[in-house]
């Protein structure tokens, strides 16, 4: 379970203090799959980074399975797998297999556990044919698949994805969605931001909408369509579409 209590995060700009996340309080239950919606700069990634113990909140408390993200970061990171948009965390001079072996060791897996996890993940994501090739020569989509496998190498109970299907072709995106459905059946807790409405509808139990750092909606996507925030939802996805074709 993930709990945020009165959480804010401020950044010092050259001329002013920017409040990226504002007074957020919410709870995400075990096994819940939650989509995070919001325009660029709304605070989605900042909130995910705080949950992952990669950023400290300026105020408030965040706990992951009862562990404080500031006071007990090691315990938090052991329970969470993370993938942030544009940041694969991979080493270009190492092969895909070597990258996964390295991160497996960082998480304390033994040799047999690492081998089994790599075999499983490479099969699921169709990566067997290029596991022994250096990541530096991969396409964006291939790198993204290895990065997803890297986030899952230690079989975490909680997974945070920031636009996880960015760079993937349709086939790979569908494989990813099928894998998320399996993780749901395994009662994994998943948070991911996305600008793909079909993806959110297909995978999420509920959604969080963020605007200017504030959580302005938390609940079922179907109810959001009927709420006063439906215009905000249309803005988010239409603005993304316009940027994509301009």
Curated annotation (Swiss-Prot):
Domain of life: Bacteria
PROSITE patterns in the cross-refs: ABC_TRANSPORTER_1 (PS00211), ABC_TRANSPORTER_2 (PS50893)
Pfam families recorded: ABC_tran
EC number, UniProt record: 7.2.2.4
A GO MF term: ATP hydrolysis activity
The reaction(s) this protein catalyses: Na(+)(in) + ATP + H2O = Na(+)(out) + ADP + phosphate + H(+)
Keywords (A to Z) from UniProt: ATP-binding, Ion transport, Nucleotide-binding, Sodium, Sodium transport, Translocase, Transport
Keyword flag Kinase: no
Induction comment: Induced by ethanol and the protonophore carbonylcyanide p-chlorophenylhydrazone (CCCP) and, more modestly, by sodium and potassium. Positively regulated by the two-component regulatory system NatK/NatR.
PANTHER family per the UniProt record, alphabetical: ABC TRANSPORTER ATP-BINDING PROTEIN (PTHR42711), ABC TRANSPORTER ATP-BINDING PROTEIN NATA (PTHR42711:SF5)
UniProt-recorded name of the protein: ABC transporter ATP-binding protein NatA
Lineage: Bacteria, Bacillati, Bacillota, Bacilli, Bacillales
Gene: natA
